[in-house]
Swiss-Prot record:
Gene3D superfamilies: Glycogen Phosphorylase B. This is Granule-bound starch synthase 1, chloroplastic/amyloplastic. It comes from Triticum aestivum. Belongs to the glycosyltransferase 1 family. Bacterial/plant glycogen synthase subfamily. Residues 1-70 form a transit peptide. ADP-alpha-D-glucose binds at K91. GO terms for biological process: starch biosynthetic process. It is found in: Plastid, Chloroplast; Plastid, Amyloplast. It catalyses: an NDP-alpha-D-glucose + [(1->4)-alpha-D-glucosyl](n) = [(1->4)-alpha-D-glucosyl](n+1) + a ribonucleoside 5'-diphosphate + H(+). Pathway: Glycan biosynthesis; starch biosynthesis. Found in seeds and pollen.
Amino acid sequence: MAALVTSQLATSGTVLSVTDRFRRPGFQGLRPRNPADAALGMRTVGASAAPKQSRKPHRFDRRCLSMVVRATGSGGMNLVFVGAEMAPWSKTGGLGDVLGGLPAAMAANGHRVMVISPRYDQYKDAWDTSVISEIKVVDRYERVRYFHCYKRGVDRVFVDHPCFLEKVRGKTKEKIYGPDAGTDYEDNQQRFSLLCQAALEVPRILDLNNNPHFSGPYAMLCRAVPRRAGEDVVFVCNDWHTGLLACYLKSNYQSNGIYRTAKVAFCIHNISYQGRFSFDDFAQLNLPDRFKSSFDFIDGYDKPVEGRKINWMKAGILQADKVLTVSPYYAEELISGEARGCELDNIMRLTGITGIVNGMDVSEWDPIKDKFLTVNYDVTTALEGKALNKEALQAEVGLPVDRKVPLVAFIGRLEEQKGPDVMIAAIPEIVKEEDVQIVLLGTGKKKFERLLKSVEEKFPTKVRAVVRFNAPLAHQMMAGADVLAVTSRFEPCGLIQLQGMRYGTPCACASTGGLVDTIVEGKTGFHMGRLSVDCNVVEPADVKKVVTTLKRAVKVVGTPAYHEMVKNCMIQDLSWKGPAKNWEDVLLELGVEGSEPGIVGEEIAPLALENVAAP
């Protein structure tokens, strides 16, 4: 059975803002004095005095006007994504990448899009809206502020509170969920309950169009299109941290006539992290007893407590109007049984689940203009370009420089899911029998970092292990490697194989999740077969699969068949454009009033139109 962790370590022409009926006497700052607030379990503080900004007002030229109108020319949908991570501001894995890339692609298709995430750092490009809410958490009220920036056609809203900002300093990495890999913060329930409630307030109280301290496209947008109430919203929740949002929406808002037509889509990025806590903790969530059954859960684990528990992800699945995940094959795996569904398979068979493969940021990962590469290349120059980058990579890590020697790369978080222990167990047999070099890059659990260094010590002329965060080296490895090894025990979608294909590097991968949907045997890579999901042991059969597949891949390197694979990898469209259209089709099925299909567009990201906070 897969090891289970209690907490993750691992536009339209409408405006989502204060409704017209709030524009009356009694308006307090950017927020009305609303009698319903008492029922919502929160208090309005309104807008505090904002610091003066010396920046000149934004001037719109014809180019700006045409951009804004084109982006909002269709009815579209009002989409509010909510998640614990949002790249590039915060990221530990694929969740951050999705909330960084998918919303921008949806906005490019004419939908009005907002993303809400915690403010873990003092982001230089996010300005203080001066809007404050007091939200009930357990038995007290907590004050939150909202910061905002407008990037790539998307409103990025950051929830500011000490429980986020004071715990994470500098690069976030795994510190979002705990001080170290494998360790959670004790107050994670309170932190993410706060996030869910704060997120529900944003479309109601954050009037970006009329804020005098904002200078950006919204000044033009509010004139170009009619204002509309923020009722017809689709909230897109992501992983267990947002599992409470649908519950709060129903109990605190819809029961009081607010967000009457709003719907919730819940996306599972990794079923292994479910938010399991003591059943007694339900009382701390301030939810009616009628929701208890959605949380009630009994498993065979003794952590965090033995016996009856609450399960945030279970509640998120049951209370959502639509359940999605990040690849079709992963959706099949989740309902296949207890082992891969992590004891929620029966729930997902009941609700149904839709899988949509992720895209990737094709501007950040682009061999044509990648600043980290020794030689840039495209599909027509890939063979020579990759050979030159291989030589540079070999020299960089201290391996013998020889472009004729096949080079295998492994890049990933050093945790059980990614199977670094399986990869390391396979290396001795591979390097003893094949003329090959292997470069390993990753950080994570100390036991795996030690394993990586130990295998380098055993094979100093054939293996290099880099156990520190090194983004430039990751790019160099993508370009210089002949084969990318992905030994994941399970992989909901996977980004690494998409990045590899973007650089013309075929992938030798385990046959699980999104790897099945994205890697085609013999055309863009090599399949190992499915590996065991038991994270506590390294199965000999799994080691054999890795050895056999990598040997097979190494023998193909340099042949005409391999050259064709490089080409096949590079000619694919791996952007968010296709996935965004699939997401649109699914979300339209929710039938939210006023929702319409979007347009076929390109991302809106001219730097001159992006809102950047004053220094």
